[in-house]
Structures are given as C-alpha cells and as structure tokens.
Curated annotation (Swiss-Prot):
This is Methionine--tRNA ligase 1. The keyword Ion transport does not apply. Its EC number is 6.1.1.10. Pfam families: Anticodon_1, tRNA-synt_1g. The gene is metG1. GO terms for molecular function: ATP binding; metal ion binding; methionine-tRNA ligase activity. GO terms for cellular component: cytosol. It is found in: Cytoplasm. A motif ('HIGH' region) lies at residues 10-20. GO terms for biological process: methionyl-tRNA aminoacylation. It catalyses: tRNA(Met) + L-methionine + ATP = L-methionyl-tRNA(Met) + AMP + diphosphate. Is required not only for elongation of protein synthesis but also for the initiation of all mRNA translation through initiator tRNA(fMet) aminoacylation. ATP binds at residue 332.
Length: 544
C-alpha cells in the first residue's frame, strides 16, 4: 500500500513552539508505524518561506526576507531532527523546484479553465504607497467581531477578504487603507462545490476526517463555495507565469498547499523513484495540521488536485485543536509559549513526544502544564515503563551475568501482546494516537504487576526454573514494548534495542528473544519537581 503523509508547513518567521509540535507529531507517528508494517511511505513537509509574515518580520528587523527564512528554516530542521521526525523530504517554498512546480500547477489550472482574470477592489495604503497583501490588513472580523487578519480569523476560522474587515488598518503604518481597482487571477472554486460536498459526506460516513474538519467544511459547503483570488501584489513569492503579470505573485493559500506536491516531485527527482503511486486514487493519504488550516486542506487542496486531474484528494484529515499553556491561550506576540529550541535543551525528546500524545488536542483544546509534564515523565516514563525495563534487565545483569535465561512464552502473555498489536495498529490508522499510547501503557502497568506478583527475587531461591520463566517472559514483554512504542518514543526504544541487540523493526510480535544483554543504563532520569517552579517563573518572566 502507498501511504502519503503531509505535515503542515510552518512559517519561517519565528521559532517553533509546542503548539506547532502538538499538531505535527501525528505525522511522524504514522510514518514510523507504516514503515514498520512494510508499507511504501512518503512523508513530506517544509518551511513556508514565502508568506507575508516573513516579509513583515524582515522589515521590522531591517534585514532581508531571505535572511529571516534561512535562519528559521535551519532552526526548524534542527528541532524536527532532535524531536525524531523522519521526513522523507523536508524542503522550503522559496526553492527553485517549488516555484517551478507551483507555476506548472497554476498553468494547468489556467489551461483547464479553472482560473480566470477579474478586476477587483483591493486595499491600498496611501502612506506606504502600495497595495496591501491580505496579512498586511488588520481589523475586526465581521462574523465574530474578534481581532483578525485580512486572510483569516483565528477566532472563528472564517476565510476572509481584507475588505470585509471592520476598522481596517495597515499593519505596517497603522493608517486606514483606501480602496483601488486592480486586476487579479481567480480560482473558480464554486465549480467544485458538489465534489467537495461528496468528499465531506464520505469522510463523515467513514470517520476519516476529524470532527472539526467535517463541521467547518459542511458550513462552507452549505454557505456555497466562493471563488478565491490566486494572485496578489506581494513582495516575495512565486511569480505569476503569465506575460505582463510577472510582478504579481501566486497567492500563498494555493501556493503553500501545493508544497506537498512539489516536495513529492523533489523527492522523486532526488531519489530516482516514481512518486505517482502516492497521487493515485488507491493511495492512502494523511494531512496533518492544526484546525486553523482546515479549509486549505478540506476545500482548497482537494479542488486544486481535482483541477489538475490527480486522483487522490485528502482521505484522512488530522486537524488537531489548539494547545494552551498553563490554562492561557498561546501568544507568540506576548511570548506566552514554550519554545521548542528551549525545551529541547533540558528535556528528553521522548518526554515531549509522550506528553504531547497522551494530552494531544485531538478533539478539544488541551493544556500544557509544567507540573503535568514533569509528573507524567516521573510517573509514566520513569516510574512505569523505565522501572519495568530497568528492574528486569538489572535482575539479569546481577543474577544471570547478562545472559537471558531460557524459557517459553506464556500463552496468556502471547495472546495479550498479539491483541495489543492489533488494537494499537487500528488506533494509529484511525488517528486515535492517545488511545493507542494509553493501551500500551496499560500493558506496561500490567507487566509491572506481573513482575511483582511473580516475585522473581524469591523464585530465584525457591524455584529457580520458575524464576527463569518469569524473567524470560519479562524480556518478551520488553522486546514487544520497544516495538510497539517505537512510533511514539523512538529514542528510548533505540536505547533498549541496543541493550537487547534487537535488529528487527517490523510491526509484529517479537517471539525470538536475545541471548544476552549489554550494559544496562537507566532508561529515564528523574526530573526534580523543583523544576516546576523554575519553569513557571521563567515562563512568566519572559512575557512581553
């Protein structure tokens, strides 16, 4: 089976925070799981280096947009690598290959009659003497009356036209813009109304889109899909490939989602492999992002794919809700966030991955609390999983000289593990990652109980053969926990694999156990709970 996984592209205008990772982590879990199953996986993403936010940041700092994009693209790559993300291709939207692919898609849509020219009114700043890109216009959302940008309202997820805003002002100078006529290209989105309606109805029946994606898309379909501008007067971006319009850029809402396609083509070019299988109707596709990106993946991108004749529109939309920080809405402008480069300096990446999975905002907003983060590490990773692995392997090291005793796999344990693979696999495929991880940790707690009840420290003296059976079965459990947890906790899984000399990584019960173990080291270190206050003080102290 061909599995395509697309992770949303973060804007390269500032550091990643845990809200980004909470929405993107499911992509890596899926990729690792499907690779272990032996499926053909293509997992792509990249840095959005063309957006208006980058141009604004560059102007504020007095540097070029390229310098800003380079800085954060490189930082993103380090963060994703240090968190264990296994992208097959992580690229950027200001690359030549991306520009060429986007321009080809634009021309194909133009040839097929899905793009047309239209004279429209656009916000113009007399002070800055320029037409204002949508994100350069700020004001009040006409739907929910919250503060909003000219392209979208974060509060109610409405896609906006900047002229719809109330109390409009230029983001650069703060003055009220005038309205002038200009010519732009438009995408005939209304012509895909019925196909999008069928797609959302199918997703509703099969449960392959998150509820928030279904509800929001149904709302747009009910209201009627409106044609959208595909060109803008932007300072940076992909030039319109039509004579006389080269100064205009392809609007980021269509250009950025086409990044999945350009990354796929770039991967094929670099590896010499054919990527068409990932765009065929039979391919299984997952698009992983936050709820603010829903309409771009449930409406815009499917319409673009249909418009260029590709068979596979998004089958699974994994659109997480928002992550709050200490019960407050995350705010980058106020510096109320937990920044990824910072937390990675002091904490195990598996601790971050664990917390953001068991507390994932899959169906509702969830909160990142330093207290909960540190206690979950100490009680679950260290106290449950790390404890079981350490006590078993230390027992072997102390009483068997590192040689794994011989035994036979207990039938009840074997059935339990086989059932666990099936249950966890189904949960991952259905994008229920929290359910999957909790099921594994239920089994870990069962394993600790098994160790306690068997009391190998007593069996060793009273019934040495039973003791060997107990320890053998504990190693059996560990070998399979490593396999089951690898999509979630890759770093600790790798450490245990090395200790047990386990090479196989396929998604099936591990029934062949190692003969000996290498030097046993603690899987996790206890985090001093005094760190809770330190981290909270640091968080509040950094607020702007």
């Amino acid at each position: 089976m061909s599995i395509f996984i697309g992770g949303a592209w973060p804007y390269a205008n500032g550091s990643l925070h845990l809200g980004h990772i909470a929405s993107l982590l499911p992509g890596d879990i899926l990729a690792r799981y499907y690779r272990a199953k032996g499926e053909n996986v293509l997992y792509v993403s990249g840095s959005d280096c063309n957006g208006t936010p980058i141009a604004i940041r560059a102007k504020q700092e007095g540097v070029t947009a390229k310098e800003i994009a380079n800085k954060y693209h490189e930082e993103f790559q380090r963060c994703f690598r240090n968190l264990g993300f296994t992208y097959d291709c992580y690229t950027r939207t200001d690359s030549e290959h991306h520009h060429k692919t986007v321009q080809k898609v634009f021309l194909r849509l133009l040839e097929e009659g899905h793009i047309y020219k239209k004279t429209v009114e656009q916000a113009y700043c007399e002070t800055c003497t320029q037409f204002l890109p949508d994100r350069y216009v700020e004001g009040i959302c006409p739907h929910c009356h919250e503060a909003a940008r000219g392209d979208q309202c974060d509060a109610c997820s409405a896609i906006l036209d900047p002229l719809d805003l109330l109390e409009k002002k230029c983001k650069l100078c703060g003055s009220a813009p005038s309205v002038q006529e200009t010519e732009h290209f438009y995408f005939a989105l209304h012509t895909f109304q019925e196909q999008i309606k069928v797609a959302v109805e199918t997703a509703k029946q099969t449960g392959t889109w998150r509820d928030n994606a279904i509800q929001l898309t149904e709302r747009y379909v009910k209201e009627g899909l409106l044609d959208r501008a595909v060109s803008r007067d932007l300072p940076i971006g992909v030039p319109i490939p039509v004579e006389g319009y080269e100064d205009k850029k392809i609007y980021v809402w269509i250009e950025a989602v086409t990044g999945y396609y350009s990354a796929s083509k770039h991967w094929a070019e670099k590896t010499g492999k054919d990527d068409q299988e990932f765009w065929d109707r039979e391919a299984k596709t997952y698009y992983v992002h936050g709820k603010d990106n829903i309409p771009f993946h449930s409406i815009i991108w499917p319409a673009v794919l249909l418009g260029i004749g590709e068979g596979t529109i998004p089958r699974h939309i994994v659109s997480n809700e928002y992550l709050t920080v200490e019960k407050r809405k995350l705010s980058t402008s106020k510096n109320w966030a937990v920044w990824v480069p910072d937390i990675l300096e002091r904490y195990d990446p598996d601790s971050i991955r664990y917390f953001l999975t068991v507390n994932a905002p899959e169906n509702r907003d969830t909160d990142f609390s330093w207290r909960e983060f540190i206690y979950s590490h100490n009680s679950e990773l260290l106290g449950a999983y790390g404890n079981f692995v350490n006590r078993t392997l230390k027992f072997i090291e102390k009483y068997y000289g590192g040689i794994v005793p011989k035994g036979s796999i207990d039938v009840e344990l074997k059935d339990k593990i086989e059932g666990l693979y099936k249950h966890v696999g189904e949960a991952i495929e259905q994008t229920k990652f929290k359910v999957a991880l909790e099921a594994i940790f239920d089994a870990v707690r069962f394993a600790n109980k098994y160790f306690d009840e068997r009391q190998p420290w007593k069996e060793r003296e009273d019934d040495p053969v039973s003791c060997e059976e107990t320890i053998y079965n504990c190693v059996y459990l560990i070998a399979n926990f490593v396999n089951l947890l690898e999509p979630f906790l890759p770093f600790s899984s790798e450490r245990v694999r090395n200790t047990l000399s386990i090479v196989k990584r396929n998604w099936e019960p591990q029934n062949t156990l190692p003969n000996r173990i290498d030097s046993v080291q603690p899987l996790f270190e206890r985090i001093d709970v005094k760190q809770i206050e330190c981290e909270i003080e640091k968080l509040y102290g950094a607020v702007k």
